[in-house]
């Protein structure tokens, strides 16, 4: 009995003298949270698939030194608790629409700014341009490391008539997805409803909401064709582009050895091609899903996108730029990419 206790205490002593980062890396499975429906590497919502692919690839390259636990469907914590939990080091990683954290960090509302991004090419160009470098810096300052850049176009699903032109929104109760989207809807005469995308179905089903803006992927994953009679797609262009990156707590990231940090960043960047292709595919697939369900499907013209953009310039952009110096700087840098 004494020999066993001695061995146990020696084992504990050995562990306590290990470099902290090595002990951390070898004993902790990193938890990744997101709000989207769970699936497999091959099937389901591409955001869940991306997280699973990312985890599998890092585990493989690290020869099992890094392991992950994935929690889809807000099964680990509430959707809106994820960002602040990462900042505190209480959650390791999450894939979140960035604008959900805009109440906590005003600069992050740029992640869903109406009409500021109008194409995938422009969206992904942010990463290497001054706006992306500044956004990455802001996030790091707030305790977050950006691992994968993920952008998605979106549209509007409606229980009644399609919402295409600004005047179509008048008198309707609509979910925009961000404070800034809500501002252009209010300007167009709509009443706004604020909730995460995983709560849209119930609100539309009960009639608490007439229409919702969200990504093409969420229109499919949350089966909104069951409660919608019309869909305005983003397949020909959109004024609704959502930045939904895979992020990591800087407190956790900084504890890892350099080779593991580098591996996370490398694999994260490699996932971006998959994200772009999957998002574009969903922009096309969503139209077929809704047509099959009997919904009226319409697209946006360049002229209509410009109308919404003009409203955004005088409302959402102006409001965002006036918030603080950081917002003004990001807005100016983003406009350089238009």
UniProtKB/Swiss-Prot annotation:
GO biological process: C4-dicarboxylate transport; transmembrane transport
Localization: Periplasm
Cellular component GO terms held in the UniProt record: periplasmic space
Record: residues binding malonate: 47, 100, 175, 197, 214-218, 244
Secretion signal, residue range per the UniProt entry: 1-25
Coiled coil start-end: none
Location, primary (coarse class): periplasm
Keywords: Periplasm, Signal, Transport
Source species, domain of life: Bacteria
Family: Belongs to the bacterial solute-binding protein 7 family.
Quaternary assembly: The complex is comprised of an extracytoplasmic solute-binding protein and a heteromeric permease formed by two transmembrane proteins.
Function comment: Solute-binding protein that binds malonate (in vitro). Probably part of a tripartite ATP-independent periplasmic (TRAP) transport system that mediates solute transport into the cytoplasm.
Protein name, as recorded: Solute-binding protein Rfer_1840
Species this protein is from: Albidiferax ferrireducens (strain ATCC BAA-621 / DSM 15236 / T118) (Rhodoferax ferrireducens)
Species classification: Bacteria, Pseudomonadati, Pseudomonadota, Betaproteobacteria, Burkholderiales
